Amino acid sequence: MADFFTTPGGIAVLILAQVLAVIGFVMVSLLFLVYGDRKIWAAVQMRRGPNVVGTFGLLQTVADALKYVVKEVVVPAGADKTVFMLAPMTSFVLALLAWAVIPFNDGWVLSDINVAILFVFAISSLEVYGVIMGGWASNSKYPFLGSLRSAAQMISYEVSLGLIIIGVIISTGSMNFGGIVAAQDGPYGFFSWYWLPHFPMVFLFFISCLAETNRPPFDLPEAESELVAGYQVEYSSTPFLLFMAGEYIAIFLMCALTSLLFFGGWLSPIPGLPDGVFWMIAKMAFFFFLFAMVKAITPRYRYDQLMRLGWKVFLPFSLVWVVFVAFAAKFEWFWGAYARWGMGG
């Protein structure tokens, strides 16, 4: 049996099993993410939230998903049916594809490529096409306006996200997530991670992630009071479910990126405790909790405020930070905290 897995067919079976394992983890996590999001929102508003279907309401997300699947798929009159159906599938598949390079532990990754950050950034940039396709193919002005806003918002904040990530790359000398985590492995545990030397950028990165994933307070494309639910207004049944699933998977991906880039990934926060996948999942869950809390307690920004924040505040600040990190790494300021090439490169 062991010899079989050394053959091309056996290797293909192993790769397929690994792919299915990652997809299974993401999809099962998705059920709990939606449930947790609704529970946190309910707790802030002093409500109970989902509590009927299953124990503590844990099966509510499954029931909602089944409800969407069994409903009729309604295509608006005059819509481009092919593009209309292709848009949610594009968003969903691209959201899943980015997980191919996300490690959960040392060596636990589908594709351990040296340009993993560029891969994730490229996939994230492509996700705007699903939104544009959905808004344009609906043959309605409300989805189209929502898709245009979403495209402008996502492209604007990708610039600041990229510059913040460049600062981490300069410090590490690597675009591989394993190398970045290895560079944060120090004797001081939690205080060896990049959140400390890159402290201002952690906040900018988190806020940019909110804007990139269209989460409150930056949910301009889905502003019900202005755009009638934005680019999703004409969608129902399974296509709408795919859009929602893709959005939550992208949010979970941003939680994973925050953990890997600034908070040590699978590294233990306490020296002496073993590292492992538990820490990675715990950090991702914590950052999703922050996403949910921000959604529950913050009002929505106006569109002009959102654009001004991205172009006039985040972009100049992150650009200056890249220059600062470059000099700090070159001349090894602050005891070499910005120059860890030998550790992670």
UniProtKB/Swiss-Prot annotation:
Record keyword tRNA processing present: no
Catalytic reactions on record: a quinone + NADH + 5 H(+)(in) = a quinol + NAD(+) + 4 H(+)(out)
GO terms of molecular function: NADH dehydrogenase activity; oxidoreductase activity, acting on NAD(P)H, quinone or similar compound as acceptor; quinone binding
GO cellular component: plasma membrane
Keywords of this entry: Cell inner membrane, Cell membrane, Membrane, NAD, Quinone, Translocase, Transmembrane, Transmembrane helix, Ubiquinone
Localization (cell): Cell inner membrane
EC number: 7.1.1.-
Manganese is among the record's keywords: no
Residue intervals passing through the bilayer: 13-33, 84-104, 115-135, 161-181, 190-210, 248-268, 277-297, 309-329
Any GO BP annotation: aerobic respiration
Principal cellular location given in the protein's record: membrane
Membrane topology: Multi-pass membrane protein
Disulfide bridge positions per record: none
Pfam families, per the entry: NADHdh (PF00146)
Subunit field text: NDH-1 is composed of 14 different subunits. Subunits NuoA, H, J, K, L, M, N constitute the membrane sector of the complex.
Family according to the record: Belongs to the complex I subunit 1 family.
PANTHER family: NADH DEHYDROGENASE SUBUNIT 1, NADH-UBIQUINONE OXIDOREDUCTASE CHAIN 1
Role description: NDH-1 shuttles electrons from NADH, via FMN and iron-sulfur (Fe-S) centers, to quinones in the respiratory chain. The immediate electron acceptor for the enzyme in this species is believed to be ubiquinone. Couples the redox reaction to proton translocation (for every two electrons transferred, four hydrogen ions are translocated across the cytoplasmic membrane), and thus conserves the redox energy in a proton gradient. This subunit may bind ubiquinone.
Name listed for the protein in its UniProt record: NADH-quinone oxidoreductase subunit H
Organism: Roseobacter denitrificans (strain ATCC 33942 / OCh 114) (Erythrobacter sp. (strain OCh 114))
